[in-house]
Amino acid sequence: MAGIHLHPHDILDEGMPAILQRLDGMKHVEHLFVEINTIFERNPYPVGDLPHNPIHNMVMGTGTLHINTHTDFPRLSQRVDPTILSGADPLMTIKKATDGGKYKVIPWANILNGDFIGDVEHNQVVDFKGRPQAHWLCPNAPDVAQLWQKTFTALKQNYGYDTFLIDRIRFPDWAGKEVNPAGLFTCFCPHCEKKMVQQGLPVNKIKHRLAALADSLKQGDFETPVTALKEEPLLKAWQLFRQQSVTQLVERLLSDAKQTAGGITLWLDLWPPAYSWILGQNYHELTRYSSTLKHFPYHKLGGGADVQGLINHFAHDSESQERAFTAFKRLFELPYDISYETFKQQGFPIHFVAEQNNKVRQLSQPNTFIYSGIQMWNLPASQLIEAVIAAEESACDSLLYYCYGWATQELFDAIGEHNTPNNNSYNNNTVKK
């Protein structure tokens, strides 16, 4: 039941015969997670070329919608990609190529991050200083649930799919076109503030405390903010509020779609548990509403976080960078005896993969199906297989590769060879179906 992520440009540029031939060679992929709306991300990230794309060396995501909804969005919508307006339809293309075959398509939607239009002002994320966070919608905003209820209903009616992987169901992290740590100190839009007051949270006191912690970070004091975020009851209550906000959005999406579309199934794309809590993601609560999830314990990339971007934003010499990295490891409970210089060269140790997978199992509701995300770009084949084996030996159920368009043929071949019977000693220890 392994899966792989595909982007719209993969389908439009390469064509389905080439894609399916390459996927057939992997020998265990069954689920194709097809992106229906892009984020502002370079493909591939952060540098390099698309290794088998005959049209583009690289593609920059623009936060646009890549499906035909044929639906009216009166208050809030996502800008439709020009390729759709000119007649392309990558999701329909892959549907026609896979219907009735061995591959199952799962549309993959980025919920709160993109190029949105309409009444953005009353739906956007706002930081602790009152600054809007560009291209981010708030889970407590009034029109977000309706936007996605209409989109999922249209997907079910127009394409026939009723199971979706939902991504970017969180508050902003610090990464993006520019490093922006203020994204972590959100959201203080009118809807969040009203809800916090209703729950007895002192909004101004929280904002003042966050401002003080931001000043500490600017002055090179990294330990005070870490201790505060981990231990202070006020900030822990605020983090819980953020987590409840994200969980309640997922609950609303399911209940609204049940009324209009007869019900849908949502799978979750989450950050590894080391980081998920600070972004508003609570595995224990979210898996009450979704029985399948994926997270991405990419050990070579710091678990998917832009660790270097954050460290270098606050620390500008080797001594302060080491102090910042030590504080970072303490905040996110990463007990690795490695220096910042070693991390920059090697990432986290390989056992990060199993540790995070096992923690997901512990945090999630019983019988949750867990995909371990596998980094399938910007690394040699030997390290790819090392990560695959580490995941296979952990508490996950299957693998989800990121991603088709960024992976070299060498990596596809390595996965196929790894999954060839009697080829290696791990074939009897494959991931559970």
Task: Label the predicted regions.
Residues 2-9, 88-89, 106-159, 251:
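Active-site-adjacent "subsite" loops/lids of carbohydrate-active enzymes
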Residues 290, 294-308, 343-419:
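Substrate-binding cleft of secreted/luminal carbohydrate-active enzymes
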Residues 131-350:
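Polysaccharide-binding and catalytic clefts of secreted carbohydrate-active enzymes
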Residues 1-15, 377-378:
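Boundary/entry segment of secreted carbohydrate-active catalytic domains
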Residues 11-25, 144-154, 275-286, 380-390:
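Short, acidic/polar
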Residues 31-85:
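Aromatic-lined carbohydrate-binding/catalytic grooves of carbohydrate-active enzymes
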Residues 10-26, 62-96, 147, 244-252, ...:
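Aromatic- and glycine-enriched glycan-recognition loops and surfaces
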Residues 17-42, 50, 158-162, 292, ...:
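Catalytic domains of carbohydrate-active enzymes, especially glycoside hydrolases
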